[in-house]
Amino acid sequence: AEVFKSEEGSVDFYGQLRPA
């Protein structure tokens, strides 16, 4: 699954926001 990571946290392929 693709995951977007940033300083604020990350969002997985399903759109779930996860803490940094």
Curated annotation (Swiss-Prot):
UniProt GO cellular component terms: cell outer membrane; pore complex
GO terms of biological process kind: monoatomic ion transport
Main location: membrane
Keyword Ion transport part of the UniProt annotation: yes
Keyword field: Cell outer membrane, Ion transport, Membrane, Porin, Transmembrane, Transmembrane beta strand, Transport
Subcellular location, record wording: Cell outer membrane
GO molecular function, one term: porin activity
Subunit structure: Homotrimer.
Purpose: Forms pores that allow passive diffusion of small molecules across the outer membrane.
Family recorded in the similarity comment: Belongs to the Gram-negative porin family.
Protein name from the UniProt record: Outer membrane protein 40Va
